[in-house]
């Protein structure tokens, strides 16, 4: 990722801005069931398996800032929320999103995620008008390229 940020520096300086976004490295995503903003189910996603990738992203950003290629203008945590009215709708979303991931989920993690989905589905079925929310903590950095080549 450092190489990619070096290349981005080359094409964006002197007047560009880079918005770098990646999943938070130390916080688990979670699945919630809500009805009228009332939380009736919340569990960490046991299928979370990209912590190392997130740490690599953190280190890459720190590396290019440390080398003076970019100035950190702002950095903040936010939550990327995916809403679904049914478990099938959430599965359809993940089928599209995961199509770009060349790695299959480890069998144990996939099974644990399915068990969580089943528990969420039970709560969803008992709560008319409720919806699922997949909450993914993320980090966003606004970087300005320095004049340094």
Question: Regions from the language model: what does each represent?
Answer:
Residues 4, 28-34, 41, 101-110:
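Short, structured coil/loop segments at alpha-helix boundaries
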């Amino acid at each position: 990722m450092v190489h990619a940020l070096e290349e981005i520096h080359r094409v964006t300086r002197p007047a560009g801005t880079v918005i770098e976004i990646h999943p938070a490295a130390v916080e688990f995503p979670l699945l919630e069931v809500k009805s009228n903003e009332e939380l009736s189910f919340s569990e960490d996603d046991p299928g979370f398996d990209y912590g190392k990738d997130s740490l690599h992203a953190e280190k890459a950003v720190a590396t290019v800032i440390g080398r003076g290629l970019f100035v950190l203008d702002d950095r903040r945590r936010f939550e990327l929320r995916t809403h679904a009215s049914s478990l099938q709708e959430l599965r359809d979303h993940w089928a599209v999103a995961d199509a770009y991931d060349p790695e299959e989920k480890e069998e144990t993690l996939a099974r644990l995620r399915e068990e969580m989905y089943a528990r969420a589905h039970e709560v969803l079925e008992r709560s008319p008008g409720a919806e699922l929310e997949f909450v993914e903590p993320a980090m966003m950095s606004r970087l300005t390229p320095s004049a340094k080549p």
